[in-house]
Amino acid sequence: MGYVVSTFYRFVHLSNYYDIRPVLKEFCVQNNIKGTIILAEQGINATIAGSQNSLDKFFSFLDLDSRLCNLQYHKSFSRCNPFSKMKVKLRKELVCLGIEDFDNSVSGEYIDPENWDNFISRSDVYTIDTRNSYEINFGKFKNSINPETNCFRDFPDWAISWAKNKIDDDPIIAMYCTGGIRCEKSTAFMKDLGFSKVYHLKGGILEYFKSTGNINNLWEGYCFTFDDRIIVDDKLVPGDVKCILCGAHVMLEDMKSISRGHVLCFSCKDHV
């Protein structure tokens, strides 16, 4: 039996987010749903996996809360469950930019996946990858800018430095990330710096793959995922991953030692 993998987020005020945690955890465990849900006062961010029936029940359960109803989510499939347990975490920030009291409500404009290729192919558009370097090493859009960050908290420093030579020209900026949440927050930061023409890929890379299949081959390589699939290709099929030490192919079932994109097979892990 295959598994459905669902990725979703929403920026919404959840004053009682700490009370939601045990309720969601219990529901997921009872319905054999695994993955990670992050709750903060700013909203919800999650990747979960289970049967289609279980996930249908989950989203119907969320619909009971007006703040979380009608969530749009990305759906893909996996032969094995890419998660070993269910985690519901509480965070100060939904996605950590490292700036206190930052208001990300005024973010950039969406570009639909079907229009993305034409948009980033324009000579007057700067395409910025808001992911971390270890993710970008697996794949990226052609000619996109790599901020060379190790974590999302590094992005503001890079953006401030990059803006020094660009802000007066007010260029067109296109931003993207895995599922959409980081580029939504980073576009708000770029607008806060003074850029006015800021856009981002709706639904992120995963939705782009699902909607377009990378028909124009503007995506190069794989997309890193934050689960045991590690990487997926533009057809959302888990990729062929190699151990960083011995170069041996690592099967999905053996990919249990993963840290920031570094994959170790069990044999090498025993000797590290």
Swiss-Prot record:
- In short, the EC number is 1.14.-.-
Q: Where are the transmembrane segments?
A: none
BP terms from Gene Ontology: tRNA modification
Record-given protein name: tRNA uridine(34) hydroxylase
Question: The Rhodanese domain covers which part of the protein?
Answer: 121-217
**Disulfide feature:** none
- Catalytic site positions: C177 (cysteine persulfide intermediate)
Q: What is the source species?
A: Ehrlichia ruminantium (strain Gardel)
Regarding protein family, the annotation reads: Belongs to the TrhO family.
The reactions it catalyses are: uridine(34) in tRNA + AH2 + O2 = 5-hydroxyuridine(34) in tRNA + A + H2O
Q: Name one Pfam family in it.
A: Rhodanese
What the entry lists under InterPro entries is as follows: Rhodanese-like_dom (IPR001763), Rhodanese-like_dom_sf (IPR036873), TrhO (IPR020936), TRHO_N (IPR040503)
Instruction: Say if the entry is tagged with keyword Oxidoreductase.
Output: yes
- Say which domain of life the source belongs to: Bacteria
Identify a single GO molecular function assigned to this protein. oxidoreductase activity, acting on paired donors, with incorporation or reduction of molecular oxygen
Coiled-coil-forming residues are none
Q: Which UniProt keywords apply?
A: Oxidoreductase, tRNA processing
Do you know which SMART domains this protein is assigned to?
Answer: RHOD
Among SUPFAM superfamilies, the record links this protein to: Rhodanese/Cell cycle control phosphatase
